[in-house]
């Protein structure tokens, strides 16, 4: 569900980005500009001055700082996702049975009873549906900040990047084909790495994102200052490392924590993972006893 909601969100962001033009001074007004873009511009200028007018380094430091700030939210999301996935191994038969009751319900009372039964299933397997629903929260929290930085780099203000534009082999204030290609490739790899631990039914949407994300990145970067391509490249590189390590760690941890529940389930049902009505006791419930 989260992946399905991500595509419309991405398309909405593309429309928003295409509709905003801060290249002209008279357009640099309004709540969003004054709250996010202007403040992010001030931070970039301060960092650039702090690094002896090295604005490429300033962009890298700012991107890493933002990623580190939202890292706890992202790690919590990885953990909850893997725990939910492991518990679904034994919870799915019960959940499918209740979903059938919801579909067959003809009255409001029947639907309410079925929904209440679904909540009991969640409780039985120590699952919190709100954790899955809030999985996009880290993205929503960082989105205004990221978009503010996007406009700062796409439409640099006078001074700063425009006057001290040299970094590595490219000009931060002008489009650069190679940093554009690097950004596109890295975003493709980031989407690809995220599929490693996904169940087959979720991979189809991820494959679509694997194509759409790089195309969007390349399309925007070709007509933007190379500073934007640098930002996307650093961000994608960080996400590749973060995704790979977090998925490897939390996948193993989730399997270890849920293993006793799966073992108890299989013992009661003779190793069958499709039987219904298993008396699964979570770790939290064990502690209460």
Curated annotation (Swiss-Prot):
Residues spanning the membrane: 55-75, 133-153, 177-197, 210-230, 231-251
Disulfide-linked positions: none
S-diacylglycerol cysteine: lipidated positions: 20
Listed PROSITE patterns: PROKAR_LIPOPROTEIN (PS51257)
Cellular location(s): Cell membrane
Leader sequence segment: 1-19
Gene Ontology terms for molecular function: membrane insertase activity
Positions where lipid (N-palmitoyl cysteine) attaches: 20
HAMAP family tied to this protein: YidC_type2 (MF_01811)
Role summary: Required for the insertion and/or proper folding and/or complex formation of integral membrane proteins into the membrane. Involved in integration of membrane proteins that insert both dependently and independently of the Sec translocase complex, as well as at least some lipoproteins.
Name of this chain's protein: Membrane protein insertase YidC
Source organism per UniProt: Staphylococcus carnosus (strain TM300)
